[in-house]
Amino acid sequence: ACEEMLSNDARKTKGSCDLFLTKKVGDRFGPVRNLEMPINTGAWESQPSFSSDGRTLYFVRAITGSDGRRQRDILMTRIGDNSAWTEPVSVSDKINTAGDEMSVFIHPDDQTLYFTSDGHPGMGGLDIFLARRQPDGSWSEPVNLGYPINTGADENSLLVSPDGKLGFFASDRAGGYGQLDLYQFELPESMRPVPVTYMKGKVYDADTKKPLAAGFELIDLATRKTVVSSTSNVGSGEYLVCLPSGKSYALNVAKDGYLFYSETFRLDDPKAASDPLVKDIPLKPIRVGESVVLKNIFFEFDKFDLKDESRAELSKVVAFLQKNSKVRVEIGGHTDNVGSKTYNLNLSDKRAKAVYDYLVGQGIPASRMSSKGYGDAKPIADNASEQGRAQNRRTEFTIVAVDQ
C-alpha cells in the first residue's frame, strides 16, 4: 500500500510505499497492520511474495541514490521462533544487479524464483527470468525465459500456476490494447517448477471434535530439514500446505494441554490444490491412560539400535516432557508376530529401553519414566498383512501419572 492511497492511522506508511499484513481467522480476515521495521523503511517497499509455509518473505525495495536514480532490488526476510522478522538481505548477488530487479514470485515449490530485470542480458527493456535454489541454499545463475515470452518491450509481473504449467504476465509489447496487457502461455518443461502436492486437513480435539489452532511442521526425512512450520487456522483448525512430490515426510503437530501427534508418509503423485491429499489430525488431551504411537521412531532391522532418522521425533518427545514436567510416562515397545514370543518380547524390551536411555541422555529424569517390552501381545492391526505387521512394530509412550 502506498502513502497517497492509505493515509489513515491504522495504515500509515513509513515511506512512499509499505507492506501490510492481515491474517485469516475462520472465514474472515483480521485487522490490517503495517509490517514495520525492519521490513518497512523510509524507502519504497512493495511486490511481496511469501514462501508456501509463510515463513519467508520476498519483496522489492527501491532506494533513491545521491544521483536521484531509484534502484530496485529483491530482498528476503524470515520470521523466527519469536515471531519477529529478520533484517532483510539481498536475495542473491547473482540475482540483483546495478539495474532493476522486481516483480518477484516464489513458486509454492519454494525452489523456483521468477522475477523481472533490466540488469541481466536480455531482449531489451524489462525481461522475465528464473533462478533455482541449489542444495546448499544458494541460487543458480538466472535464466532468461527467452522469445516469444520476452521481447524488446517490457515484460513483468509473472505468476505461475500451482501445477507449473501455465504462466501469466504483463507486457506493453506492440499489438496490445494499450499500455500493459495481460498474456498467458504454457511454460516449457525446462522452465517449470518442481512438481508439488497440496495437503490439507483440520486439527481438532479428539473428544469434543472442536477445531484447534495448533503448531505443525513437516520434515523431509531424507535431509532431516523442516520444510513447513506453521499453525492451523485459529477459527477453523484448518491448514493447507504445499510440498515437493516424490519424498517421505514426518508430520508433527503440537498444542499446549494435548499430547503431540506424529506420522510418517510418502508423497508420490502430485495433487492439485483443487484435489489435495487430506489429513485430519485429532489431538488427545493430556490425561492418565492416553498414549501416543511414535510413528517416526526407526530401528535397524531385527536390532534395537536407533536410526538417525529418529532424532527429529525424539526431540519432540524431549520437548513435550520438558514442557509438561508433571507428566510421568511409560515407553512401550511392540512387535509383530513373526518369530518366537520370547524373541519378540526381548527385542521389544530392548527397543523400549533404547528410547528410554536416549531420553535420559537428553536430561529427562529417569524417575519420570519407565520402559517395557510387550512383544506381540498388543497388536493394533491384523498381522496377516505386511501393512498390518508394520503398524504393530511400534514404540508408544503412555501417560501413567500427572503429578499435582
Question: For the regions a protein language model found, what residue spans apply to each?
Answer:
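Short, ordered, surface-exposed loop/turn motifs in non-cytosolic proteins
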Residues: Q71, D207-R224
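A short, solvent-exposed beta-strand micro-motif common in secreted/extracellular proteins
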Residues: G237, K247-G257
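Short, conserved micro-motifs composed of acidic
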Residues: A1-K202, A206-D207, K247, P270-P276, ...
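Short, acidic Ser/Thr/Gly-rich low-complexity loop/linker segments typical of extracellular
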Residues: A222-E238
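Short, solvent-exposed beta-strand/turn patches at coil↔beta or beta↔helix junctions
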Residues: I286-V327, T335-N346, A401
